[in-house]
Amino acid sequence: MSLIFADEAWEDYLYWQKQDKHMIERINKLIREVQREPFTGIGKPEALKHSLSGFWSRRITDEHRMVYRVEGDAVLIAQWRFHY
């Protein structure tokens, strides 16, 4: 699956690259996992509801979540920092 980053998600990704190598390693691991298995696996995948229906989240840490949506054979990453 290919990756598409929303503007905010790309800014978040660059932030983690500069701020925390451990965090970026975890994020890269989640990217690989989502590309293989978008709805199962590590990070406790959870389908979101209400205004975020169609999006999924995975835990990066207790504070931060990966929020994404599968569109055909692409994954749109919406955000990496904080809760949705």
Q: Where are these predicted regions, by residue range?
A:
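Enriched for short, Lys/Arg-rich terminal
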Residues: 2, 8-25, 42, 48-49, ...
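Compact soluble domain cores
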Residues: 24-37
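Short, functionally important structural connectors and interaction interfaces within domains
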Residues: 31-32, 40, 44, 52
